Amino acid sequence: MPNMSLTKVPMPEQDPNVRNKNFLEVAMGYTEEMAMEEASRCLNCKNKPCVSGCPVNVRIPEFVAKVAEGKFEEAYEIITSTNSLPAISGRVCPQENQCEGKCVRGIKGESVSIGRLERFCADYHMKHSDAKAVKPQSNGKKVAVVGAGPSGLTCAGDLAKKGYEVTVFEAFHTAGGVLVYGIPEFRLPKAIVKKEVENLQDLGVEVKTNMVIGRVLSVDELFEMGYKAIFIGSGAGLPSFMGIEGEDLIGVYSANEYLTRTNLMKAYLDDYDTPIIKSKSVAVVGVGNVAMDAARCAKRLGAENVYIVYRRGMEEMPARKEEVHHAMEEGIIFKNLNNPVKILGDENGRVRAMECIEMELGEPDASGRRKPIAKEGSNFELPVDTVIMSIGTSPNPLIRSTTPGLDTNKRGCLVVNEDTMQTTREGVYAGGDAVTGAATVILAMGAGKQAAQSIDEYLSKN
């Protein structure tokens, strides 16, 4: 009989007043007993609606049933038959909008905690198993993957399992893409990403770092080197700004730069060549998951006051509820229904305040959310010494500008056939944020998986 508890088994977490001063992982993971108890809540539905909500097609009821039986390694094998990065997706996937959003248990009560169970299985395997993935027999065909982020790594893993000789070209000095530069340690430990990459290398995937495709090598040169197909998963790392006065002041960062300096470069250390500013009061403009990450990092780096400035209200926030909840627990101050007008500097060109105007919500706009309308005469100054802009990113134009025949849309995103993920160049495929603009890790993984299947079909005919 299923466990008919209406609520999930709670996830153990660090105390908010402790964790907001360190970069250790907030969520501490299920014990074996917790995992089995939570897994027993699954009804093993005949129609399996949860699977339809998973972009990488994990056979969810099957692996959950194995967890309930205490057969954790078997559960892991089921997960990794379709998901190359379970320890990552189990931590950062917005399950509430994907598999858990379709869980029947969520109709009356809380859905089964599929993400926590996936994470548990991956962590259990890392801790208890010395077994390495076995490299399949090569089929002799070479495929290049541009970008070692979630879409590129997923595509590489799926192709390697089919016997392709896969080389991943990564612009940074370490593999992981947004997983290492964008997502903080307290949400996704870098050791986890490193281990998942090593698992792919065991399958035969070669990773070459410090390789900026479009500068060091072009897409055409990759074809000349013998690669039969190319997947572009170069992400969307070009930050957007509001275009308001004062964005050139010292102390204004894009969230992309702030998080990269913090997560990847550890620029908060005193001996770093270009240290990040030691802030006392920080305003983060925007309210997506990236904004939450930036705000929570600023708090951990010693800022006394950290504000999230957003022109709409709590109900319109696109960030995951869990991330908003954690941010509020950690003392982040939400300044909703406020919009920046300009950033004010002192005589040394450093940020001293941000001028904002109060907003009110009108009728819904094209996004379906109520349109924010400025309240005339309500301007005020928010005293801050650092401003972090987190209002979106777009793909870097380097690859498209050096690759003839590669079409993009008006946002600079690569145009692909949505069924095959093939671009307007034969043999060139793309997925993830390079195609969609900034989106979720799991959607990028799904695109990488879809592209791998299409590349396999393409090369099987050629």
What are these regions (language model features)?
Residues K141-T167, A291-K299:
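N-terminal Rossmann-like FAD-binding beta1-loop-alpha1 element of flavoenzymes
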Residues Q137, K142-V146, K194-I244, K342-V351, ...:
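Feature captures the FAD/FMN-dependent oxidoreductase FAD-binding
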Residues S52, V56-K135, Q201, T209, ...:
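Glycine/serine-rich phosphate-binding loop and adjoining beta1-alpha1 elements at the start
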Residues D248-K278, P364-A438:
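FAD-site-proximal beta/loop scaffold in flavoenzymes
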Residues A434-K461:
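A conserved FAD-binding loop/helix module that cradles the flavin
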Residues E165-V168, F172-L203, V207, A295-K342:
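Rossmann-like dinucleotide-binding cores of NAD(P)H-dependent redox enzymes
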Residues F120-Q137, K195-R215, P239-L301, N409-D419, ...:
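Glycine-rich dinucleotide-binding loop and its adjacent helix/turn
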Residues S84, G149-P150, T174, G288-V290, ...:
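Residue-level detector of alpha-helix initiation sites
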